[in-house]
Amino acid sequence: MRIIFLRKEYLSLLPSMIASLFSANGVAAVTDSCQGYDVKASCQASRQSLSGITQDWSIADGQWLVFSDMTNNASGGAVFLQQGAEFSLLPENETGMTLFANNTVTGEYNNGGAIFAKENSTLNLTDVIFSGNVAGGYGGAIYSSGTNDTGAVDLRVTNAMFRNNIANDGKGGAIYTINNDVYLSDVIFDNNQAYTSTSYSDGDGGAIDVTDNNSDSKHPSGYTIVNNTAFTNNTAEGYGGAIYTNSVTAPYLIDISVDDSYSQNGGVLVDENNSAAGYGDGPSSAAGGFMYLGLSEVTFDIADGKTLVIGNTENDGAVDSIAGTGLITKTGSGDLVLNADNNDFTGEMQIENGEVTLGRSNSLMNVGDTHCQDDPQDCYGLTIGSIDQYQNQAELNVGSTQQTFVHALTGFQNGTLNIDAGGNVTVNQGSFAGIIEGAGQLTIAQNGSYVLAGAQSMALTGDIVVDDGAVLSLEGDAADLTALQDDPQSIVLNGGVLDLSDFSTWQSGTSYNDGLEVSGSSGTVIGSQDVVDLAGGDNLHIGGDGKDGVYVVVDASDGQVSLANNNSYLGTTQIASGTLMVSDNSQLGDTHYNRQVIFTDKQQESVMEITSDVDTRSDAAGHGRDIEMRADGEVAVDAGVDTQWGALMADSSGQHQDEGSTLTKTGAGTLELTASGTTQSAVRVEEGTLKGDVADILPYASSLWVGDGATFVTGADQDIQSIDAISSGTIDISDGTVLRLTGQDTSVALNASLFNGDGTLVNATDGVTLTGELNTNLETDSLTYLSNVTVNGNLTNTSGAVSLQNGVAGDTLTVNGDYTGGGTLLLDSELNGDDSVSDQLVMNGNTAGNTTVVVNSITGIGEPTSTGIKVVDFAADPTQFQNNAQFSLAGSGYVNMGAYDYTLVEDNNDWYLRSQEVTPPSPPDPDPTPDPDPTPDPDPTPDPEPTPAYQPVLNAKVGGYLNNLRAANQAFMMERRDHAGGDGQTLNLRVIGGDYHYTAAGQLAQHEDTSTVQLSGDLFSGRWGTDGEWMLGIVGGYSDNQGDSRSNMTGTRADNQNHGYAVGLTSSWFQHGNQKQGAWLDSWLQYAWFSNDVSEQEDGTDHYHSSGIIASLEAGYQWLPGRGVVIEPQAQVIYQGVQQDDFTAANRARVSQSQGDDIQTRLGLHSEWRTAVHVIPTLDLNYYHDPHSTEIEEDGSTISDDAVKQRGEIKVGVTGNISQRVSLRGSVAWQKGSDDFAQTAGFLSMTVKW
């Protein structure tokens, strides 16, 4: 059988031709082998393998060159090319044909079931059929790879058919080409398939896979031209049922065209029934049934009068779908019809010329999503028309479908959007300057924003619907207005905004139905120019039942807007710019609803001017009309006008736009607020009066500023966060009302003269400072600074604190009304003698309550006082005013400076700080019973009133200093038997624990716990004379002492602690060393150093050091009268040279030790009874004498401690021998002295002899 193609359009007959070719009379009969490359008679060719050479085949008219039934386990079932080989199959004239049928390569890594070409090899194929070829890997029919060189086309296929070819485990069911330039013209791809293994990495491109994987960004990507080519019934288990394309770096370019030569089917080329599974079980729109494009740019170039149809609306939407992230451009003046679900195409799409028709609803929703996600600020979706190609005409025709575009739909002036009856296009963003026509509907989606420019963009005979929160902006000029007046556009506001502010020719006084027919359930109209006159709602503002009506937005720039009376719109009135003139409440919409007036634009000046006595309170609404702050706004009330409004409200949209905004009250009239407010705006009263009619009209306002000549009247109880300190007007606190400062700015002082009236100023903010003269009552709920303030009213300080503390003493607070205490008074004061400067509270009215006083001692050294330091002055006439206030110092009731504690005492109605305890004089004896009528003597000279006896009150810390100094000098004292060598011992360990207490200076109860550990040992010893003996040793010790001092006057307590170390030498001499009797001498010398702490609650801790020499010389005579009894008189002189360092105490006092070194003497008698049982009882009697007092000097005041200058001691003990060389000694000692001095100490020592 002979088949001859007379014209290219006969390709549609190829399926039947192939069937006949394989019949008994067809190719099956072609058994002769080819005898060269010039085929004159049909023949069967063998497998061709070319390397770097050229092979051109020529097939005579009516003859067949057949490559069939070849099976190979390597790439290229019929033809293998490498190293730039060139392979051509061309008809000699027109009808010579080539057939590749049933060729197979096995193995998943072997490619090209019919032809394999690599390394820039070239294929040029004309009049060719590929049928039933199978590749184990890529390219069921053809595999071609190159390097994207700039030379000729790598793969050229013309007038061909690919049918039933399979890529078993790869890509490209018919053709796989990588890094190549490809030209396909007049080709049919039918029923080709790309499969994949379980790795799900292959199976792309059911018909063709064109890919570029060159990672060199400087190397150009390839391109593919697909002209007059049909794709039907192709499938991919992966992506791209008909076409898969992608690139690694620069986009791969594909041109899919239908040119002028295509005439079949009336010039309509149909691609259909292609599908991709995306590795799933069935067709997937995300996989791209027709095409999946990654980093590729695809151009659909359709010639004039031609149509390319992709998909069939009768099929599932996934079939013939387009998916991916690349760029699609429509060029050519012909038509492109998309009938599938293309919502998984998220790249950009441009219609530059011709028409694109969408045959399925919601089929391009997500165009532009990939780029918009990457760069939301530069977001594009679908573009219709072009600025560069302005001579072209581009159109998107949705017909009667329903289309939604998530991202921008942009139409240029040469773009057209056609929506037929029943159709709808929903947009979220973008603009359109071209033509929007048809009987369908354009919808601006909820919260969307869209711009229509020019009358041509409003040529729909259907509606433009603006949904809730959406904004439709119209732009135009005089010509556009004329066109719209001839054919008005219907706009339906369903909660949206119609913005006409950029429609430059909308004139004052015109009605919006001069070009627009506005209707809907609710919405906002933003007007243009000077006046928006709303006299009802005819065709303009229509409110549905149960819903808010259309809002009125005034956006008048520098102009004014006047509203007609009896407006019936149900929404709010919003002022974005300009001035809204108000003379009647009914101008602002239906008074049954009484919707608020809202200031909305932060960038523009917005004013509401009230020109007559407008009372916005409505009986039907039950409230006044509120003023809502979303931006700065000004309320101007003309002179003589008194107007009542509802509340000053926060931003009800939830955007908190009132924060940072300011309401300014201007004009000489009065603005009265009749409901509690919520705004956080600042409020400025520049002129006239702002008055409250109910409580808390501004409780959350960030600040209130009242300018010179302006007035704020409370009218009721008001909470105000903060008064602006630079205010210079008047704040009138009405009688019976309070103004409470809840969050006052404490960084600057507030001028008290701002306030007047018969009400009460209440400070509820810690740290507020008032200055000057306050002409109203004051209540302090929190800390309030009132240095040098005069209160011409009552001062109530029951729960807060009044402070005059500023680091400078001598300030006054004068109260010319009644003073009621209960809180705290904080003062600065010098703490010296009677002439110390101090802050004072001066009271000129009745007083009551108990006030706690806190004194900050800014300077002073502490001195005894007589009268004291006056801090509270009751200056009123006691015969006319009651003085029942009580004052007491905070905490312990005392304040310390230096060595003295000051307390607060009342004297003749005034209150003083005194550093003495006052001992009242003894009362006089009662008058005796007079004798009857004695002759009176001349009046005797009356005795003067007895002067009270004053005793200074010492601070308890003084006792702590004395304790530490005494402990430092006493801790390491020893007698002869207390160290090694003193009683024949070689090594001695001594542990001492003691406790003493006494009264210092007649008022400080001293207590001290002492503990000491000493270790001593002999270094050298020798003979002295006949039987005398001497010894020299060393000693070291550690002492830890803790105590306290309690004031018997104030009850205060100070704790003290010191711990230290000592090292030194010991020496002993015995007259009769062996007998241990007769005269002896003992001495020691030690250096001691201590770390000391003294602390008092609320007064900090003092840290200081002490160190010095202590030494002793002791003598005695040991007498043995017999029977083991020892009698030993002793005398000891002890040098005490431990001195404390000078230091500054926590109360800033300078503390030093006033007396120098001291000499202590001891006279004693030691006795013991040496028994035969190795236990020796002992008894010691001692008398101690200190010639000097222990003295501390604190800020020039000397405090002496004479309590322990003389004391006696009884000590009993026992010594036991553990072995011949080791013995233990223990004793207990009791001391008593003057001023209740008593000490108990225990001693334990272990001695070793060898």
Curated annotation (Swiss-Prot):
Region feature (15 X 2 AA approximate tandem repeats of [DTPE]-P): 919-948
Keyword Repeat among UniProt keywords: yes
Keywords: Cell adhesion, Cell outer membrane, Hydrolase, Membrane, Periplasm, Protease, Repeat, Secreted, Serine protease, Signal
Signal peptide range: 1-28
Gene Ontology CC: cell outer membrane; cell surface; extracellular region; periplasmic space
Protein name (Swiss-Prot/TrEMBL): Probable autotransporter YfaL
Native organism: Escherichia coli (strain K12)
PTM info: An approximately 170 kDa protein is detected in the outer membrane, while a C-terminal 55 kDa fragment is detected in whole cells. The full-length putative autotransporter may be cleaved to release the mature protein from the outer membrane; Pefabloc SC, a Ser-Thr protease inhibitor prevents the appearance of the 55 kDa C--terminal fragment.
Disrupted gene: phenotype observed: No change in cell adhesion or biofilm formation.
Primary role: Probably an autotransporter. Upon overexpression shows increased adherence to polyvinyl chloride (PVC) plates, increased mature biofilm formation.
Domain of life of the organism encoding this protein: Bacteria
